[in-house]
A protein has these predicted regions:
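Short, solvent-exposed recognition patches
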Residues: 107, 174-259
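A short, solvent-exposed beta-edge/loop patch
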Residues: 226-229, 250-299
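Second-shell loop/turn segments in exported
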Residues: 93, 155-160, 234-239, 273-281
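N-terminal "mature-domain start" segment
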Residues: 76, 83, 94-98, 102, ...
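Structured segments of extracytoplasmic/periplasmic soluble domains
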Residues: 70, 77-80, 84, 106-117, ...
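Solvent-exposed, acidic/flexible segments
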Residues: 162-166, 229-233, 243-246, 278-285
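Amphipathic alpha-helical assembly segments used for oligomerization, scaffolding, or translocation
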Residues: 2-163
Length: 299
């Protein structure tokens, strides 16, 4: 093969050459427009929908958290009162327990739970606005607090008049209107003979009153002091170990009411029986009795 043939053989054939064509400017422009449009649409969607939606969700969650907090405060107040009601301590005034139950029922009925979050942004905003206005429990919290305090006070009063000491009764009787003298009975001058006996009173404090015509009273023979005259001279406070003993005594005295053995008015306060002279009018008895009850139960 001569030199010319070698050169011809070494040259690539024009027919076997790959023709790499560049994309036209029109296609590039179209692609760019599409990309820009997609980016613009995405940005528009994010700005006009996703951001407002996220903000709405945040507002909703914040409102829900606020309502949860208000609900927790209400639940705590309800729980505190329920715990007090469930304790072994009993109130002096049982109506305080009824009032506490009513306050709890009203609070539970007023409680609002957080609703489910809607999917629509506008609906989320609307629901969040509603939630912010929910859970104003100021009235219920005040009622629960009042019921709690009243019940606790009544429990404390019951403890105070449950087998109180003799000295406590004496101190609470001294200085009351129309009570001129106070003296605790001893076994030697107890007109009823019930002191320290099984089912009898643990102490009995007698008092005299300036409303009683003492010339109409008579001391038990051989007895001295205010107790010797019994309840006729003014009255007495008999203290028992249990409510049952006090109620049993009150029932016994009630059987004598209206007869020649009637010894005056009588009422049970805790484990005490407050008695007032039969020589006083009904209104006088009531006034002295209430004065004594108020003093014994004063915290």
């Amino acid at each position: 093969m001569d030199e010319n043939e070698k050169q011809a053989a070494s040259k690539p054939s024009a027919e076997g050459t790959v023709n790499h064509k560049r994309p036209s400017a029109k296609i590039i422009a179209i692609v760019c427009v599409v990309i820009v449009a997609v980016i613009a649409a995405s940005a528009c969607w994010f700005v006009n929908y996703q951001i407002p939606h996220n903000e709405a969700v945040e507002v909703f969650n914040a409102a829900a958290k606020g309502l949860d907090s208000r609900n927790a405060k209400l639940d705590d107040a309800i729980s505190d009162l329920q715990d007090l009601m469930g304790s072994d301590d009993k109130p002096l005034d049982t109506s305080m327990s009824d009032a506490a139950s009513a306050a709890i029922g009203d609070a539970q009925a007023a409680k609002k739970d957080v609703p489910e979050m809607p999917s629509d942004t506008d609906a989320i905003n609307a629901e969040a606005k509603k939630i912010k206005g929910m859970g104003d429990y100021s009235e219920q919290l005040t009622a629960l607090d009042t019921a709690n305090q009243n019940l606790q006070n009544s429990i404390d009063q019951m403890k105070q008049v449950t087998n109180p000491s003799e000295q406590f009764v004496i101190e609470r009787l001294q200085g009351l209107p129309n009570i001129t003298g106070v003296e605790a009975a001893r076994e030697q001058n107890d007109p009823n003979g019930n002191l320290h006996k099984d089912g009898g009173y643990t102490s009995a404090v007698f008092f005299s009153s300036d409303l009683v015509d003492q010339s109409q009273t008579y001391a038990s023979e051989g007895y001295t002091g205010i107790p010797a005259i019994g309840t006729d001279g003014g009255g007495s406070v008999e203290v028992y170990a249990t409510i049952e003993d006090a109620q049993k005594r009150d029932t016994y005295l009630g059987a004598l009411d209206g007869g020649i053995l009637s010894s005056g008015s009588h009422t049970v306060v805790g484990t005490c029986v407050v008695r007032v002279s039969d020589l006083l009018t009904a209104s006088q008895q009531k006034a002295i009795e209430q004065s004594i009850i108020d003093s014994l139960t004063r915290l």
